[in-house]
A protein has these predicted regions:
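An amphipathic, basic-hydrophobic helix/alpha-beta surface used to engage anionic
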Residues: 1-104, 139-144, 159-163, 210
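Amphipathic coiled-coil/heptad-repeat helices and related helical stalk/stem segments
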Residues: 3, 70, 125-128, 153-157, ...
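Conserved, well-folded catalytic cores of nucleic-acid-processing
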Residues: 27, 76, 112, 116-119, ...
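Conserved phosphate/pyrophosphate-binding and hydrolysis machinery centered on Walker-type P-loop NTPases
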Residues: 59, 63, 99, 122, ...
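Short, contiguous acidic/charged loop-to-helix segments that flank catalytic cores in large enzymes
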Residues: 59-62, 116-120, 143-152, 160, ...
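Short, charged loop segments at secondary-structure junctions
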Residues: 97-123
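A general structural motif
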Residues: 120-130, 203
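Von Willebrand factor type A / integrin I
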Residues: 138, 152, 156-244
């Protein structure tokens, strides 16, 4: 059930059938009717299940952390009257739970995510992009959980990320390696420790470079630790929502 709420300027992507011809004639530019349910945003968690998500921290893989964060974000989004959806992919597109806020939807998300496991294959971002564009006609906030160890691994996927961001608001979420953080935090005493320290610093620099490169292309990026993932993702969602 949708109730009429207001008339606004037509923008590309609005439903042509909703054009208000009387208001258009009066203002001499296209106007369209807005209904209450259109104010809700679509929030779609896209989870990479490829081998980059197999890394473990405290007995859980990065995939496990991404699943937990997706569940929390979906719940919060629906409480905020947004529609939550889920996609998973690895070397092929796998699951899709269309965005919704209906009763029982959270259970469907839970059941879909409960059975997920990482794959040994390299993830296919090309297939993901094609399916996102096919399944999501409405501009959505797409929260992509993946992992980029360095700028080179990200740049291979950058054309697809740019394409996704053109149609949607893309937030790329990836992980700080906690062991690297510990290496950087400790003062090296031996040559071997110094060598490890230098490598850890280089990895950390590469990840910061990934964030700045994505931002330079207008793509939101969140680099976080596994244990802070859910809180950081929720805060980022609320920040984005306050700006729309």
């Amino acid at each position: 059930h949708t109730e009429f709420e207001q008339i606004k300027d037509y923008v590309v992507g609005d439903d042509f059938r909703r054009i208000n011809w009387r208001a258009t004639a009066r203002t001499s530019h296209l106007m369209t009717n807005v209904y209450q349910d259109e104010r809700s945003q679509q929030v779609v968690c896209v989870i990479d299940k490829g081998r980059v998500m197999q890394q473990a921290f405290r007995g859980m893989t990065y995939l496990d952390y991404a699943i937990n964060a997706s569940l929390v974000l979906s719940y919060i989004a629906m409480r905020k009257e947004d529609k939550a959806g889920i996609m998973t992919f690895s070397d092929r597109f796998e699951d899709f739970v269309p965005p919704s806020a209906r009763r029982g939807h959270m259970q469907q998300i839970l059941e879909t995510l409960y059975r997920q496991q990482t794959q040994f294959a390299e993830s296919d971002f090309s297939a993901l992009t094609a399916h996102v564009n096919q399944h999501l006609s409405k501009r959505s906030l797409v929260v992509l959980y993946t992992n980029f160890a360095n700028k080179v691994s990200m740049e291979r996927q950058l054309p697809y990320l740019i394409q996704l961001n053109r149609r949607h608001r893309l937030l790329v979420v990836f992980f700080v390696d906690n062991e690297l953080k510990e290496y950087i935090a400790t003062r090296p005493d031996t040559d071997e420790e110094y060598y490890r320290h230098v490598i850890a610093e280089q990895f950390a620099y590469e990840q910061r470079l990934v964030v700045s490169t994505l931002k330079n292309h207008g793509i939101l990026a969140l680099l976080t630790t596994p244990e802070n993932l859910s809180v950081d993702v929720i805060n980022k969602y609320l920040e984005i929502k306050s700006q729309t």
